[in-house]
Each structure stands twice: as C-alpha cells, then as structure tokens.
C-alpha cells in the first residue's frame, strides 16, 4: 500500500449524528446483535471493532466542540528525538503524508499540529461515546451480570512527540496500549494494575474466565493470576516493527526488523539485518520518570550487564517466534 498516495484532508467534521459515520454504524449494528443475542440461551462472543482514532480524523461536530478552545501546544523539548537514537528508529511520517493538508516533506506548522491533536482527542471522545452505548445496552438487557468485557487498542500513536507523527515505531508511545477488563465475578472496587502485560495474554485470559481449555499451546498467559495476585508475573513485553517503513504492509520489502523488550525500568531494541541476521543498531532507554526515552544509553560501559541481560531476552523471543 502506498501510504503517501492520494488522500483527502486529515480532518473531517460534520454536524451529523453518530450513525452518519462508520464507527457509529458499527455501534448501531452491535446494539441490534446484542438485542438478538440476549434472547438466546447460548453463550456468545461479540467482537466490536472501531476505526477511530486512526487517520483520517473523522467525527461528528459535537465531539470536536469539546476540544475546540483547548490548547495542545507542548514544550519544544517534548518533541525532540531521543539523543543518540539511530536513524532506523524513525520514519518520515508516511501515515500522515499524502493528505491534502500535509506537506510531503518538512515540519508541520504549530497551527496544524494543534489542530491534529484536537482532532485526535475528539475521535477518542467519539469512540468513548460508542463504548458507552454498548455498556448501556448490556446493562439494559441485564447482560452485564454474566458478560466479560475487554476494551483494548492495537497500537499507540505519536502526536508530534519525539518528532514523530503516526505509529509503526518501537518507542513507548506506539507499543503501549490501553487495556481494560471487566468480569462480574469481581465485586471489589476497580483497580489499576501496573505490571507489564501483552496483547497475547487476552485470549488465554478469556478462555480462563470462561472455563475453556485452549486448543493448543499459547505464548500468552492468563491475566487472572495477576488480577488475583497469585503469581509472580513475567513483567516483560515484546514488540517488533520492520524497516523501511513501507515494508509494514509488504514483507518482501523488509530489509531490517526491530525487536524491542520492555521491562519495568528499561526498553531495549535491537535492529537485525534480515539478510545476514546481524545486529546493526542498538537502543537502550531508561523508562523512569523524566528520563524516559530521552537518551539512547546503549554502548555505555556502566550498562553492559543490563544490555546483555535484555539482549538474551530478545534472542530467546526471536528464536521462539521465528521458527
């Protein structure tokens, strides 16, 4: 796919009801299916997928109005690339380029940056409203008493941070996603769990809650044990993205693959040449407080032991999943 092809504007706003937009139509159909499923005595699984807040940022005007007068101007330091980060870590914002209101090269104006941030948040509010409608229908039908609900995203998104727009990097903002789980068997007040988990843990979690046995061995682990404080958790998560950027949708164009592991205190990324399997670039970032992903520390003598430990994690992951 040519992500710099002919596109319209990045932002589309219309004073129309939610159902005039695709995600609103998805919600309407999901509500109908819940009505139908509630009349059946059979267990059901319903997946509801939304496009927003992916580009283009399209939403009913009422959600845009929430952020119309808010300021999204950040400090200049927040938009700088990490010190000593290799060029391969970045891209030219291909996901954003090609829209009629975005230059093919160079930076965005402050006005356009702020407009894009407002539109992104407006799309998040649009989807928040759609999820609210689904939860309201479950309660209306009495299904919330025996339904497990999982809300998650497939990737993060840069809005100018680290001088990036879009996704498809191994940085924290692209790899970290929201994950909310509701199960009626837990009566206590909601809680936030700060342990590191992976999206591959969702399926074994659902089968566990439903009393089902997975059909085969899984890489993920049930989060039930973590929720109930019954296990020392793995506290590591892996992600990967290819280069060049255009290879995201075409494996034959890949020349390098970047593997990253996130632990409590560190993010470590190794870039491999696909032809030779040699490591071409390394990135080590402290993830604590204000230092998070500000400087690539790889190669510094004081971090040799940490790098060796994290590299072993990546090698084990790579060897296990690339067979």
Give, region by region, the residue ranges found by the protein language model.
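C-terminal helix-rich "cap/oligomerization" subdomain common to oxidoreductases
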Residues: 47, 310, 314-323
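C-terminal cap/loop subdomain of S1 sulfatases and analogous C-terminal strand-loop tails that border
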Residues: 155-161, 187, 200-203, 208-287, ...
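Active-site-proximal cap/lid insertion segments
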Residues: 1-27, 33-42, 47-146, 150-196, ...
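Hydrophobic residues within well-ordered, non-membrane alpha-helices that form the packing/core
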Residues: 33-34, 135, 227, 314, ...
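Carboxylate-dense, calcium-coordinating segments in secreted/extracellular and ER-lumen proteins
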Residues: 293-297
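Compositionally biased, low-complexity linear motifs
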Residues: 300-313
């Amino acid at each position: 796919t040519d992500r710099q092809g002919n596109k319209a504007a990045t932002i589309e706003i219309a004073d129309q009801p939610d159902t005039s937009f695709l995600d609103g139509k998805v919600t309407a159909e999901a509500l109908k299916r819940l009505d139908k499923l509630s009349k059946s005595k059979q267990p059901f699984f319903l997946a509801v997928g939304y496009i927003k807040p992916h580009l283009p940022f399209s939403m009913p005007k009422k959600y845009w109005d929430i952020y119309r007068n808010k300021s999204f101007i950040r400090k200049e330091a927040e938009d700088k690339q990490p010190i000593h980060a290799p060029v391969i870590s970045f891209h030219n914002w291909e996901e954003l380029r090609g829209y009629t209101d975005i230059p093919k090269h160079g930076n965005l104006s402050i006005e356009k940056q702020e407009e894009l941030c407002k539109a992104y948040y407006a799309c998040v509010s649009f989807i928040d409203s759609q999820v609210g409608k689904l939860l309201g229908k479950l309660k209306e039908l009495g299904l919330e008493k025996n339904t497990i609900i999982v809300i998650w995203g497939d990737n993060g998104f840069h809005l100018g941070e680290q001088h990036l727009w879009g996704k498809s990097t191994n940085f924290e903002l692209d790899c970290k996603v929201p994950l909310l789980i509701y199960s009626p068997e837990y009566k206590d007040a909601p809680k936030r769990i700060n342990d590191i988990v992976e999206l591959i843990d969702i399926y074994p979690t659902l089968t566990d809650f439903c009393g089902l046995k997975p059909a085969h061995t899984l890489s993920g682990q049930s989060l039930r044990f973590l929720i109930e404080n019954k296990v020392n958790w793995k506290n590591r998560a892996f992600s990967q993205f290819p280069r060049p950027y255009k290879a995201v949708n075409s494996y034959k164009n890949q020349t390098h693959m970047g593997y990253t592991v996130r632990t409590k205190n560190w993010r470590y990324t190794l870039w491999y040449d696909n032809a030779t399997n040699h490591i071409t670039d390394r990135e080590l970032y402290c993830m604590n407080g204000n230092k998070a992903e500000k400087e690539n520390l790889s190669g510094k003598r004081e971090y040799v032991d940490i790098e060796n430990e994290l590299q072993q994690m990546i090698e084990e992951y790579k060897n296990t999943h690339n067979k």
